[in-house]
């Protein structure tokens, strides 16, 4: 007949990896598996050995085995207490930084304290939490913007976090917040207009220099004559073939064979006084 574990309802669940054994845990005499105290049978697969009858739940605890070179944390602390903080030396045998360890317990604390509590310049021996000895100016002191006090008078990272490691100026500056980079004001306030751009006298629209008429919708006002000489028309006055004519409405220069202005939204007729010079009329006049 298989036995069923009678788990105590008041016992809190505990993971296997939460630390070492507890006092009331028991070892299976068959397979050597360590079982929680609430188990009545071994939970090892294919074992189910019942708990020994002589188990009184108060066996001596076994300290955890530490690797060589590691210092033991001392007496076993229950799950309710916080883990110890090693202030007097490195818990791994040798110091990690600069070959020197942190200040030991019960050492007079010199210099300004960054905390608002009065410790009477001495911390109690064996205290787990205490302010680290910090070399350098106290935090939030007056000074230059990027001086020894850090950014905006903030202490350097070694003072703020108590890392206990030496940092060069480059490393400390890398951990600081970078100031915002603002480009030159001239690049931000760059003028949107160019020297050769022109303003429409009718609607006030600013046009690019290459435009000959205003590009504002339903405007099409020609470029003022004072600025038209430098514009790049399809047919300039210098390169216009003989017999070309200028539109009286928009000022566009048209080829001789055109009878109407080819400017968009213009379509004005060719002036009558110049119609006789058109090549299309020449054959008819010669025929007569």
Curated annotation (Swiss-Prot):
PANTHER family per record: ZINC FINGER RAN-BINDING DOMAIN-CONTAINING PROTEIN 2, ZINC FINGER RAN-BINDING DOMAIN-CONTAINING PROTEIN 2 ZRANB2-RELATED
GO molecular-function term, one example from the UniProt record: mRNA binding
Start and end residues of each stretch annotated as Disordered: 1-24, 52-77, 176-198, 222-248, 265-288
Record field: compositional bias (Polar residues): 1-11, 223-241
Compositional bias segments (type: Basic and acidic residues): 15-24, 181-197
Highest taxon in the source lineage: Eukaryota
Organism annotation: Arabidopsis thaliana (Mouse-ear cress)
Organism lineage: Eukaryota, Viridiplantae, Streptophyta, Embryophyta, Tracheophyta
Listed name of the protein: RanBP2-type zinc finger protein At1g67325
Keyword Metal-binding recorded: yes
Zinc finger (RanBP2-type): 22-53, 194-225, 241-272
Listed InterPro entries: Znf_RanBP2 (IPR001876), Znf_RanBP2_sf (IPR036443)
Keywords: Metal-binding, Phosphoprotein, Repeat, Zinc, Zinc-finger
Positions of modified residues (Phosphoserine): 278
């Amino acid at each position: 007949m298989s036995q069923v574990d009678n788990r105590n309802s008041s016992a809190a669940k505990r993971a296997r990896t939460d630390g070492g054994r507890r006092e009331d845990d028991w070892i299976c005499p068959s397979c050597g598996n360590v079982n929680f105290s609430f188990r009545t049978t071994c939970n090892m697969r294919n074992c189910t050995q019942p708990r020994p009858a002589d188990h009184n739940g108060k066996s001596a605890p076994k300290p955890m085995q530490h690797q060589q070179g590691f210092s033991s944390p001392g007496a076993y602390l229950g799950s309710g207490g916080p883990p110890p903080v090693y202030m007097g030396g490195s818990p791994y045998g040798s110091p990690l930084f600069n070959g020197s360890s942190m200040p030991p317990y019960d050492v007079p604390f010199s210099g300004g304290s960054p905390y608002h509590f009065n410790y009477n310049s001495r911390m109690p021996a064996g205290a787990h939490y205490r302010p680290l000895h910090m070399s350098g100016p106290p935090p939030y002191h007056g000074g230059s913007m990027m001086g020894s006090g850090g950014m905006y008078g903030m202490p350097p990272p070694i003072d703020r976090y108590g890392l206990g490691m030496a940092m060069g100026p480059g490393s400390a500056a890398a951990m600081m917040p970078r100031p915002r980079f603002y480009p030159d004001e001239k690049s931000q306030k760059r003028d949107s207009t160019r020297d050769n751009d022109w303003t429409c006298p009718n609607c006030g629209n600013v046009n690019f220099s290459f435009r000959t008429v205003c590009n504002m919708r339903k405007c099409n006002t020609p470029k003022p004559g004072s600025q038209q000489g430098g514009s790049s028309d399809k047919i300039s006055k210098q390169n216009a073939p003989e017999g070309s004519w200028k539109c009286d409405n928009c000022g566009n220069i048209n080829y001789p064979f055109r009878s109407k202005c080819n400017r968009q939204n213009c379509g004005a007729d060719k002036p009558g006084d110049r119609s006789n010079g058109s090549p299309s009329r020449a054959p008819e006049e010669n025929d007569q």
